């Protein structure tokens, strides 16, 4: 028997590291060694790939990739609909890190918060979305898929040939996800485009509007979601902006968390966190508006009386508030038929599909990641039937839900359309998974230039000996000050963990607790007009009618302990938590910017 060779501790450590990497199936490059949380592991050599195995043309990063262990028992691939973005080069990441350390933050004017859709998407340019190429029933499935792959590669080539990577925003490079959109549009009678009211221009691609209303001849309903996170005057201003530029739109205001009008909703107010109990989903604002829009579109071709009766039952149940537990609520409500679509259902059906077949209207829900598509379906159903998460890309395949026997909802995975938006704004819009960001500091700087983060969070400059003295801030200083305030330290050297602090600040922004709201063009000059508009007062009253009046709702002062922060950083599903959270304003600080301070009620020793 050969003699055993010595095996050092260093070799054993290396062996365990390699084993962990193989087990996790890390397809992406690891974080840069300069990250405070990534330790000494070097990032792997960048891999290039495309969504369907065609010739390698661009650097692709697959987000939230799971270990490759083959197909599941039902042939399900968990990585099939993962987000695929163009990878940032190492040079670009390092350049942005240097800028975060060197560039002094300068507050921007209110006019700089105004976004015009013409500047974001440039309608008529190559910033389109991929269309399904022509096909016939004589083609085999393999021929059709090969044709779609070639067409998709040509689509990517046109975009990357017209714009540089630095100018382009993140957008979806996964053909499988675009196929989901094609199928949803083909099977839908009415299309809902869900947007976030804080930045609806970001989530509204004009190319999709032209395709749905023009080529397909379908009705498009624009849902301005999360209206509780923006001042009512701004909501009304955005509604009129889209009506003016896109007259064929049907616009609906929606939120799953309507606010109590007894508390102020002005920007700059302090937030408390409240937990929705019992029939929380039945308090959604907007189902009645959506029903009226669908009635105007179908003009009597579909019997929607059962939907109206359901809304009346939900409103009555929410007003009584006689159910205290979520389990009782789910047992008490009628069953919802859920159909998970398979590959056979993804086969093309042709543009000549019969509308309102068998007296059923199919409503397709499309939009960007993290705009609240799944929450909207939960709000329409009246209870939780769809898993929701703060992490974009959570919906991995589309399912259909029968709201009533004559109304079918279809949930599509989120899609990012190509645009010219700054990538920092996309991160703040929740489009890019925060846990996967290689360089979060410039996004924090983008936020701090538009809302007074340092004042709202009572941050002290890291180099300031005198708290009353003025010091120039850079993005790195903001992150370091927040790490010092929260006690975020690295494991070995106990330095301020600026990477974790930056992620924490970005999560506060995405969750709406540091709310950055963009404005339509001309809003700054006409702000007083919109605040006194009749629809603004009507919106405030409508939120009051569905607000917390007698239902079980608990409010707790937000202290954001380290343990609570860790739960947020793990991106747990709302299903696992068993209850939803919303932020409730409690006082107005008079700030002119749409930012809320959840820490103003805390003393120095409590932070």
From Swiss-Prot:
Which residues, renumbered to this chain, carry the PTM Phosphoserine?
A: 32-34, 51, 68, 324, 561-563
PROSITE patterns reported for this sequence: G_CP (PS51721)
Bias (Acidic residues) occurs at: 550-585
- Positions with a binding annotation for GTP: 225-228, 367-374, 411-415
Q: Which GO terms describe its biological process?
A: DNA damage response
According to the UniProt entry, its GO molecular function terms are: GTP binding; GTPase activity
- In the UniProt record, does the keyword Nuclease occur? no
User: Where are the membrane-spanning stretches?
Assistant: none
Which residues does UniProt call coiled coil?
none
Q: Which residues carry this modification: Phosphothreonine?
A: 48, 50
- Give start and end of each CP-type G domain: 178-418
Q: Name the source's superkingdom.
A: Eukaryota
Compositionally biased residues, Basic and acidic residues: 15-26
Record field: compositional bias (Basic residues): 1-14
Disulphide bridges = none
Q: Please provide the record's keywords in A-Z order.
A: GTP-binding, Nucleotide-binding, Phosphoprotein
Domain remark text: In contrast to other GTP-binding proteins, this family is characterized by a circular permutation of the GTPase motifs described by a G4-G1-G3 pattern.
Write out the similarity annotation.
Belongs to the TRAFAC class YlqF/YawG GTPase family.
What is the name of the protein in this document?
Guanine nucleotide-binding protein-like 1
The species this protein belongs to is Rattus norvegicus (Rat)
**Gene behind this chain?**
Gnl1
């Amino acid at each position: 028997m050969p003699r055993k060779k010595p095996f050092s501790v260093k070799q054993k450590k290396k062996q365990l590291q390699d084993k962990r990497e193989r087990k996790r199936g890390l397809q992406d490059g690891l974080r840069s060694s300069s990250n405070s949380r990534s330790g000494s592991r070097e990032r792997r050599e960048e891999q290039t790939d495309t969504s369907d195995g065609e010739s390698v043309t661009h650097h692709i990063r697959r987000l939230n990739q799971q270990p490759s262990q083959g197909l599941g028992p039902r042939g399900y691939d968990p990585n099939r609909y993962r987000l695929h973005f163009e990878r940032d080069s190492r040079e670009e990441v390092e350049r942005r890190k240097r800028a975060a350390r060197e560039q002094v933050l300068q507050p921007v004017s209110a006019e700089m918060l105004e976004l015009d859709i013409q500047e974001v998407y440039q309608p008529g340019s190559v910033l389109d979305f991929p269309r399904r190429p022509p096909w016939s029933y004589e083609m085999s499935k393999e021929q059709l898929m090969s044709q779609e792959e070639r067409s998709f590669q040509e689509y990517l080539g046109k975009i990357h040939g017209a714009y540089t990577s630095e100018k382009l925003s993140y957008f979806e490079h996964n053909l499988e996800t675009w196929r989901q959109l094609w199928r949803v549009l083909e099977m839908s009678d009415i299309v809902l485009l869900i947007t976030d009211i804080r930045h609806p221009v970001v989530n509204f691609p004009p190319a999709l509007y032209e395709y749905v209303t023009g080529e397909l001849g379908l009705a498009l309903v624009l849902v301005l979601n999360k209206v509780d996170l923006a001042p009512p005057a701004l909501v009304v201003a955005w509604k009129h902006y889209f009506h003016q530029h896109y007259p064929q739109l049907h616009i609906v205001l929606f939120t799953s968390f309507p606010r109590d009008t007894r508390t102020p909703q002005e920007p700059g107010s302090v937030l408390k966190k409240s937990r929705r109990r019992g029939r929380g989903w039945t308090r959604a604002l907007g189902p009645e508006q959506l029903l009226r829009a669908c009635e105007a579109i179908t003009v009597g071709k579909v019997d929607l009386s059962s939907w109206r009766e359901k809304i009346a039952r939900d409103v009555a149940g929410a007003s009584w508030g006689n159910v205290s537990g979520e389990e009782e609520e789910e047992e008490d409500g009628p069953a919802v038929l859920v159909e998970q679509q398979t590959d056979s259902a993804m086969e093309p059906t042709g543009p000549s599909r019969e509308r309102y077949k068998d007296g059923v209207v199919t409503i397709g829900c499309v939009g960007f990641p993290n705009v609240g598509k799944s929450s909207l379906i939960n709000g329409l159903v009246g209870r939780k039937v769809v898993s929701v998460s703060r992490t974009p890309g959570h919906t991995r395949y589309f399912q259909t839900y029968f709201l009533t026997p004559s109304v079918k909802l279809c949930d599509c995975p989120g899609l990012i359309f190509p645009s010219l938006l700054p990538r920092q704004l996309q991160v703040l819009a929740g489009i890019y998974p925060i846990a996967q960001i290689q360089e979060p500091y410039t996004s924090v700087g983008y936020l701090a230039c538009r809302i007074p983060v340092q004042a709202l969070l009572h941050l002290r400059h890291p180099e300031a000996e005198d708290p009353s003295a003025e010091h120039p801030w850079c993005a790195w200083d903001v992150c370091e000050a927040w790490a010092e305030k929260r006690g975020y330290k690295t494991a070995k050297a106990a330095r301020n963990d600026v990477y974790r602090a930056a992620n924490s600040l970005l999560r506060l922004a995405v969750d709406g607790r540091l709310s950055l709201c963009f404005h339509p063009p001309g809003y700054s000059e006409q702000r007083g007009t919109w605040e006194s508009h009749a629809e603004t007062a009507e919106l405030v009253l409508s939120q009051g009618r569905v607000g917390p009046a007698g239902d079980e709702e608990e409010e707790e002062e937000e202290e954001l302990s380290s343990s609570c922060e860790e739960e947020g950083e793990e991106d747990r599903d709302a299903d696992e938590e068993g209850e939803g959270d919303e932020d409730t304003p409690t006082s107005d600080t008079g700030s002119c910017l749409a930012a809320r301070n959840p820490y103003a009620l805390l003393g120095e020793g409590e932070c």
